[in-house]
Amino acid sequence: METKLMSFRDTIILAMSEEMRRDENVLLMGEDVGVFGGDFGTSVGMLEEFGPERVRDCPISEAAISGAAAGAAMTGLCPIVDMTFMDFSVIAMDNIVNQAAKTRYMFGGKGQVPITIRCAAGNGVGSAAQHSQSLESWFTHIPGLKVVAPGTPADMKGLLKSSIRDNNPVIILEYKSEFNQKGEVPVDPDYTIPLGVGEIKREGTDVTVVTYGKMLRRVMQAAEELAEEGISVEVVDPRTLVPLDKEIIINSVKKTGKVVLVNDAHKTSGFIGEISAIISESEAFDYLDAPIRRCAGEDVPMPYAQNLENAMIPTVESIKEAIRKTHNKQ
């Protein structure tokens, strides 16, 4: 498969542009998506190609944007919403949770709401407490929503395109600190990744680490460094949180007998707690040789100071230490 080295940012532009060329019903809407090219540069050049009818600059009202998008989706269009910071999605919760997520069910499966809501999540760029949250577990709790958290540029392309083509509302996380990170991306305009299919990012035999999104790069580095210590780490990336590929997680835990769960979101009620419950309630529980361990963000608001911000979420070193303790059955 032919690939090209691309950043997350350029991959997002490519995936949206390919889908807008494929389907004239697809449009992009949000604050500053047109003339400015997106707050994070994720729609640069799209206004020039597709025009203001399909790349729509909107007023600063997330409630209005999400409501207009939900209505457009219900009447045959396929809107992509740039919510900019994920923190701002809370202003749009009624339209996302009570309208978009419930419509198909309340109309007996006859109503479709093909809306993709792109959210810039996580810390790492000095955006402080109101612009640095990872709120995926808020949305995984809501039946009717799909939630996607790509950890590589290739996965971003395949999963974003599948999200746009899906006839249900999808929340997709784009981690701000990763926009400039690069990886090989398939150039095929028909390249997609099915929602609900995870991937083993690294084979191992001693400890399973389940992670997604922003933390994948750090976990992969930790696994590589621990290999020099003789610890073989298997890295499982579910890629999609809802629907979740439970089988790939359970099978890996059965293989290694030990598991560490890593995310950057706050530890309390974070999504990795749900993964822990799934493992505990499955046949994998009988294979465990050590307690399930979580490595997650601290339960405090995100500081602005860089040194404090860096201390807020798992580092390569803290991930390595969690894996070591689990490997040693501590």
Segments (PLM) and residue ranges:
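Thiamine diphosphate
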Residues: 1-169, 173, 176-330
